[in-house]
Amino acid sequence: MKPARQAVDGVLLLNKPVGITSNAALQKAKWLLNAKKAGHTGTLDPFADGLLPLCFGEATKFSAYLLDADKRYRAILQLGVTTRTGDPEGEVLATREVRATCADIRAALPAFVGEIEQIPPMHSALKHQGRPLYEYARAGVEIARAPRRVHIRALDLFKCAPPRAVVDVQCSAGTYVRTLAEDLGNALGCGAHLTALTRTASGGFLLEQAHTLAELEATNAGARQALLLPADCLVAHLPSVHLGETAAASLRQGRSVPDAADRRGLVRVYDGHGVFVGLAEAEAGKLVPRRLIATVQA
């Protein structure tokens, strides 16, 4: 009999394989770690692989900071073929001759760098009236979608052998790389879809740091938690504040504490022993608790 689930806290950088959903990968890791509470920080489609940070226990309180972080991807485009879903899982809608050269592809990329508008794909988890768009799409219902602004920080041609091209994308959260591929194909006059997609970075985390499910499974059950990063790694971009024990205890109890420094905004708070207390808002000469680590866990 599997032992009772534990209060596991931390972040697992997972290298999700192709062929499973992000939730299936999460549930497998949760089972292997015997964890009570878990969540991920941004879905990868089943056909995609790469970095999928998973949050456990107290770390789930800070997952939004990574969910909203920039992402990096390596995408393989098939020019001249469009599919219903914009990826290899959808039926082929049209095939066209590809006349674009590598020089043409490279010349088309700058138009997609910066702030651009995207119409979210129907085959996405974006919700309309409480239901994900992909449910409407499967039922053959088309929903009008408003364009959304996203930011493409960088878009580079990594490899080129038409009708295939490999591009590296650095983008804001909420960017649909499938839509970017389709729009690039349209700009080249031939259409396109993604045949593969790998997330190579999320926030400050890199794919090279990630563990596979096979690696997690092969690790002794008692040593698996050693693969987790501490919860405060999710907010490492914020400035830190170290408090004495009395002030830290007050903050843990949900009370604001005086702050002598002239600063504003969110800060990471640590006690005198370097233990992460949580996040506080620096305002008007005090630190106001915003998101705290539970000191007693069931």
From Swiss-Prot:
It holds the Pfam family TruB_C_2. The active site is at D45 (nucleophile). It comes from the Bacteria. Signal peptide: none annotated. The keyword tRNA processing applies. CDD domains: PseudoU_synth_EcTruB (cd02573), PUA_TruB_bacterial (cd21152). Keywords: Isomerase, tRNA processing. Its EC number is 5.4.99.25. InterPro entries: PsdUridine_synth_cat_dom_sf, PsdUridine_synth_N, PUA-like_sf, PUA_sf, tRNA_psdUridine_synth_TruB, tRNA_sdUridine_synth_fam1_C, TruB_C. GO terms for molecular function: RNA binding; tRNA pseudouridine(55) synthase activity. It is an enzyme of class 5 (isomerase). HAMAP family: TruB_bact (MF_01080). Responsible for synthesis of pseudouridine from uracil-55 in the psi GC loop of transfer RNAs. This is tRNA pseudouridine synthase B. It comes from Thiobacillus denitrificans (strain ATCC 25259 / T1).
